[in-house]
Amino acid sequence: MNEIKDTDSKKSEEYEDDFEKDLEWLINENEKSDASIIEMACEKEENINQDLKENETVIEHTKQHSDPDKSLQDDVSPRRNDIISVPGIQPLDPISDSDSENSFQESKLESQKDLEEEEDEEVRRYIMEKIVQANKLLQNQEPVNDKRERKLKFKDKLADLEVPPLEDTNTSKNYFENERNMFGKLSQLCISNDFGQENVLLSLTNASCEENKDRTILVERDGKFELLNLQDIASQGFLPPINNANSTENDPQHLLLRSSNSSVSGTKKEDSAAKIHAVTHSSTGEPLVYIPQPPLNRKTCPSSAANSDRSKGKGKYNHRTQSARISPVTSTYCLSPRQKELQKQLEQKREKLKREEEQRKIEEEKEKKRENDIVFKAWLQKKREQVLEMRRIQRAKEIEDMNSRQENRDPQQAFRLWLKKKHEEQMKERKTEELRKQEECLFFLKGTEGRERAFKQWLRRKRIEKIAEQQAVRERTRQLRLEAKHSKQLQHHLYMSEAKPFRFTDHYN
């Protein structure tokens, strides 16, 4: 334990005062100490197991060789008295044997428990010492330098850009203007009692009718009334041309207004327009019976369709953006036949353009593929030509080398080589013939003299073969040296043939 403490103190002095390094050092030291403690515990357990095995063998031996004398028991008991106390054994009493076994097992368990408790106490004590040392080291450390550059940096603000909410001023102005125009106009309303018709009658004089054409009109949508500018409706193309054939006979006194569920804010110009029908009065001023006329286009928008301007009729005003009040669905229930035809034509044009674009992309891909194939084929042909050219050049070089060797070779030397090869071939043939004859004669040789003679001949033949091989190797090396020397001489002559009399060469730089 003292040695471990000394090593820990030395290592702590060697480290710098960096907090992160000290933490890593403490963690590593704790791991090492834990590993050493575990090894010590394992060694102790092994020693205990060995002692227990020895005790068991001794007890079995005493059971097998039990004597009335107690000399053996006296010898065994002092040796193992520190761990197990073996009781006296009677050879013919099975009950005493079982009692002794039980007592032995109990003593074994108690000894194991004591050892485990001692080991746990040692481990706890060692860990507490290490914790105290670590706390002392942390207390003795200098405070952390705040000016040191940190690895992790955080921003003061998470959001770099904050966008303020939009205020829809135009909608609020229109709302207040509609509220002012609605004041005092509800007394002039006359709603028809016919079921299934959503019509509103306005009983106005001629002057008021002309004024309303310049100003506003009351429109009903799903049981809600709104004041809208007549010029805006006419400019958007929602009002059909009014038939003024009977205007000289009967002046229009009442206007029957019918509107669809579409918004008049200008976002959807393909919605159905409000239908205005002139209803005549009698000359006496008494109103006639008002029969509501059905619209020309019977495919009206149902009441369940999405209405984007329902919030206008309510007293509460929601400050929301314009995109939130626009319904994403474009309904075709309230479109006129002409508008439907135009829509179909637009869809056909879009489909046609889309098909043309797809066809153009397919053609471009085919063209690119064709160009790539052409380029690849050209590159492959070029590579083949290069390979063939390289082979042709290599073959020409080999032929030139062979010709140069044949030209530069001495005829006398070639004759000598040929003669030598012939001589070697003849020698080989003679040797093979002699060997064959010797093999035939071995059958007739008898006694030690014949065997010794054959062995000597075999040794002589082996020596001759070895000498011939050495001579052949020497001749081959000499020939290679001569060829190398000749090639160097040729290179030197070629280099010297290039005359460079007017060139200055500085040999010192």
Swiss-Prot record:
Taxon lineage: Eukaryota, Metazoa, Chordata, Craniata, Vertebrata
Similarity-based family: Belongs to the CCDC181 family.
Protein name: Coiled-coil domain-containing protein 181
Example GO molecular function: microtubule binding
Domain of life of the source: Eukaryota
Segments of skewed composition (Polar residues): 320-334
Function according to Swiss-Prot or TrEMBL: Microtubule-binding protein that localizes to the microtubular manchette of elongating spermatids.
Subcellular compartments: Cytoplasm, Cytoskeleton; Cell projection, Cilium, Flagellum
Chain coiled-coil ranges: 335-375
Basic and acidic residues composition-biased segments: 60-82, 338-367
Quaternary organization: Homodimer. Interacts with HOOK1. Interacts with HOOK2. Interacts with HOOK3.
GO cellular component terms attached to this protein's record: cytoplasm; manchette; microtubule; sperm flagellum
